[in-house]
Amino acid sequence: MDNGLAFRESMTQRTRAFALRVFKLCSSLPGTPESLHMRDQLFRCATSVAANYRASGRAKSDKDYLNKLKICEEESDEAEFWMDMLVACELVKRHKIEALMKEANELTAIITTSCITKRRNMKKSGGRKPA
């Protein structure tokens, strides 16, 4: 397996694991209307990161690939926002989800770098090279 495929597989598994960890967090939240709203938002973001990263592997073009990565970037950042809100609203202690928040931040950084690299490569090739 070449480095690109190994990286893609690693990130696919990592984003899936992130979504599963968020699921466990969401399952532990209280059932108040406010908590349910934040839970639903967080769960949608985390699962969107995993689903769109997986879908990026089947992109039909460079633009399609980049679009899916941009969705992942936005959703992982938003997931971190909702976790921060859970802490700010005192629904979860920060120390209990610090590692999960760090993972959201790291995923955002990795995906942002991938977007930058892809744009640079598209510019060099005139955007004609398939993803």
Positions of PLM-derived features:
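Short, C-terminally biased terminal segments at protein or domain edges
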Residues: 1-131
